[in-house]
């Protein structure tokens, strides 16, 4: 029986985490005796840093690979891996692959959609509670050693509008419902109401402004595609309540940041919680750093202590399907972009 060559390229190349990749490689190898796994993580980082000879060494591994499991992969992957048939990324979002040579190729692309729902759902609630309970104000008063009393808000009976009802959007809806909130959402198709169990009002994507106008919190949980790039701009901010906050845990490019800054300056909205920005890291001279009503986190909402295990569990489940000729989970529709 012919061997199946798998190349792993993970971000877990830190010398302080020597067990990370070893555990991943062992787990993948245990799926089948046919599997032959090699680790290209260190070489991929070396190539990124421009270290001499690293590209040639990585090319030797890529040339053998039929399957690649990883993150931060080379943009010319298809050209360098002629035997490649399937790539599974360790992320849910696949927008970075749209500029690689596998996007318009027969190579199957899958992601790990679903594993982020719990940590990101909690992160969204954290943002909402911080705004409702005025946590940024509390932190500033503590730093100034000031005892300034204020009136906190509550989430109960407030309306949350979720833009995008995938696994993350559905988990946000479930958590918000537990807080006694009214839940609205938009999605491309409203033909599957069973997927909207915790949603009080489901709207097609074309009725976004209605959702914006009724929401106290707007949560961006849609992938970045040609359709959603710049989805939230000046007109959308004008449609929002001046007391509403926007939270983005999708991709930075979904929000027009210049329009967001103008909306904050004009007090068209009450605040923004941003785990993602158009440029990452956020440039030091960005004005977004300086607003009292903007909470910034460095694209970490999807993280959790055992992230790599969850991601690799899903890859191994897909690997079993691949070996048995079954349809893979989380196959990316390259025309739609997710």
Please report, for each region that a protein language model flagged, where it lies by residue.
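N-terminal glycine-/charge-rich "phosphate-binding" loop or analogous flexible N-terminal tail
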Residues: 1-67
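Phosphate-coordination loops involved in phosphoryl transfer and adenosine-cofactor binding
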Residues: 3, 106, 156-159, 243
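Phosphate/diphosphate ligand-binding glycine-rich loop within oxidoreductases
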Residues: 64-139, 153
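Oxidoreductase and adenylate-handling cofactor-binding alpha/beta cores
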Residues: 121-137, 178-181, 313-326
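Glycine-rich NAD(P)-binding loop of Rossmann-like domains
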Residues: 138-171, 200, 206
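Conserved beta-strand positions in the Rossmann-like core of class I SAM-dependent methyltransferases
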Residues: 184
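Rossmann-like adenosine-cofactor binding region
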Residues: 189-287
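Rossmann-like dinucleotide-binding domain for NAD(H)/NADP(H)
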Residues: 243-245, 249-338
């Amino acid at each position: 029986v012919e061997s199946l060559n798998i190349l792993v390229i993970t971000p877990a190349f830190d010398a302080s985490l020597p067990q990370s990749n070893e555990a991943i490689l062992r787990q993948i190898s245990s799926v089948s005796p046919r599997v032959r796994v090699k680790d290209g993580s260190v070489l991929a980082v070396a190539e990124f840093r421009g270290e001499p000879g690293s590209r040639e060494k990585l090319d030797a591994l890529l040339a053998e690979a039929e399957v690649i499991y990883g993150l931060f992969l080379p943009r010319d992957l298809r050209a360098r891996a002629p035997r490649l048939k399937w790539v599974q990324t360790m992320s849910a979002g696949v927008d970075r692959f749209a500029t690689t040579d596998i996007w318009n190729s027969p190579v199957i692309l899958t992601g790990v959609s679903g594993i982020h729902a719990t940590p990101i759902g909690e992160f969204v609630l954290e943002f909402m509670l911080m705004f409702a309970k005025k946590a940024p104000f509390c932190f500033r008063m503590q730093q100034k050693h000031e005892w300034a009393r204020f009136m906190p808000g509550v989430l109960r009976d407030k309306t949350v509008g979720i833009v995008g009802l995938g696994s993350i959007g559905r988990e946000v809806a479930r958590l918000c419902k537990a807080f006694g909130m009214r839940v609205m959402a938009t999605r491309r198709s409203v033909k599957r109401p069973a997927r909207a169990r915790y949603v009080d009002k489901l709207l097609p994507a074309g009725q976004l402004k209605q959702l914006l106008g009724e929401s106290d919190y707007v949560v961006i949980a849609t992938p970045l595609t040609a359709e959603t790039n710049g989805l939230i701009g000046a007109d959308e901010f004008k449609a929002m309540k001046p007391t509403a906050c926007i939270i983005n845990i999708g991709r930075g490019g979904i929000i027009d940041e210049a329009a967001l800054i103008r909306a904050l300056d004009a007090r068209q909205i009450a605040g923004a919680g941003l785990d993602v920005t158009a440029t990452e890291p956020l440039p030091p001279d960005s004005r977004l750093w300086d607003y009292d009503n903007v909470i910034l986190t460095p694209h970490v909402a999807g993280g959790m202590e055992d992230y790599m295990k969850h991601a690799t569990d899903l890859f191994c489940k897909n690997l079993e399907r691949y070996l048995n000729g079954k349809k893979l989970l989380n196959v990316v529709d390259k025309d739609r972009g997710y």
